[in-house]
Amino acid sequence: MIRCHFARLLGEKKLKISDVSRDTGINRGTLTRLYYETSERYEVEVLNQLCRYFGCEIGTLLEYIEDVDGATG
């Protein structure tokens, strides 16, 4: 599974979803789904904008964690 660390980054920088939305132009709903890890897909442009905004690499924002049951897909 893919784990998104957007919520952690917000906390570390003491930012709100609305701050990031305003500063990047990314839709608030998109950011909310990233925050609660309910996104079913990740758009490359959104990830690019977030990495630029936070000054981080993609591995800081997303992490692959192997499923415990070994299921794929």
Question: Which role does the model predict for each range below?
Answer:
Residues 22, 36, 63:
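Phosphate-coordinating loops and pocket residues in cytosolic domains that bind phosphorylated ligands
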Residues 33, 62-73:
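Short, charged recognition helix plus adjacent turn
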Residues 38-43, 70-72:
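Short, solvent-exposed alpha-helical "recognition" segments
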Residues 26-41:
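Recognition helix of helix-turn-helix/homeodomain-like DNA-binding domains
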Residues 1-18, 23:
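A short, Lys/Arg-rich alpha-helix, primarily the initiator
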Residues 45-60:
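DNA major-groove recognition helix of helix-turn-helix/homeodomain DNA-binding modules
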